[in-house]
Amino acid sequence: MSRRKFIRGSAILGASVAMPSLLTAQSGMYSSKENRKIHKILDAEREMVGTLPIMRAFAGDHLDHVSPFVLFDEFGPVDIKAGADALRVNAHPHAGVTPTTYFLSGSGHHKDSLNYDFQVQTGEYMMFSSGRGAIHMEESGQKLKDEGGRIHGFQIWLNTPAAYKLDDPTTTVFRDSHMPTIVNKHYTGRVVLGELDGYKSTIKTFTPAFYYYLKLNKQARLNIPTNPDHNAFMYCVSGSVEIEEQNKLKPNQIVLYKRGQGNINLYSEAGAEVFLLGGQPLNEPVFSYGPFVMNTEKQIMQCINDYNSGKMGDPNKVNQ
């Protein structure tokens, strides 16, 4: 099935809970029974969302290996001239899922039917917990419109467990103080979710998850322990990373790991940027239709009816 479309239904396996820490390997790449094995390496696909170019790594597929996440998009990098029209995704609904946005450079403007209106800056993290349903609009930030510059970031969706899918929606922007930065001789990292090497994010999620942005220095050798019952995947932004079984991860590629072992072993000769994510898979069925991610087809139909009847808000008002 194409990664351009969400699947209509898929079971996800369950798992237990643990927080990882980091160890530094004493040599280069090596194999070990304790290292996670590779399930698959995928090339992200180029698409357009509104007027924004993206690279899509997955969208509703491979859930047995990426849950609790359901979508991974890299947007940009795109250089914007001062005074140019904003890169924009017009008002659209969500339900049963938490779209999150993180900017490596530039800024974004989020406006929604909950009366939130945010400018999200570089290094900040936004969570749009859509719950039973809400509408939002996204575009490049005001500073980029006024001064020009580069926009580059990631929109990654977290699936919402069944117990919380019909909660009231809410939007939150998290500043630097919520996400610790790690600086050492091997890498510079941001702990957006979860815990790494004793540094812990204060951001709460419905189910245990980790989300690390890592800038690897030259000849960085890392062995990152994770819960062997949790999913894990890694996306390469720039540079290249040597991983298990003599494979090399290149820009716009994502590696999905198997469960059963905990350690993620990697090495970068010339340096690299990667996102490493994962967490406890949900033991629940998934029915999805575009921006709606629910547990039954009946719930999907209710989402469509709620949107069409205006219960999620007025898209014309959000677009203003």
Where are the language model's segments positioned?
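A short glycine-rich, His/Asp/Glu-containing loop-to-beta-strand
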Residues: 45-101, 182-223
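C-terminal flanking tails of non-heme Fe-dependent oxygenases
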Residues: 252, 273, 277-320
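Ligand-binding loop in jelly-roll beta-barrel domains
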Residues: 131-164, 259-288
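N-terminal export signals
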Residues: 5-26
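Short acidic-glycine-tyrosine-enriched beta hairpin
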Residues: 114-129, 243-264
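Glycine- and acidic-residue-biased ligand/ion/polar-headgroup-sensing regions
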Residues: 95-109, 132, 227-245, 250-251
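C-terminal segment of N-terminal export signals and the immediately downstream linker at the start
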Residues: 1, 21-42, 320
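Extended, compositionally biased flexible segments
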Residues: 77-144, 148
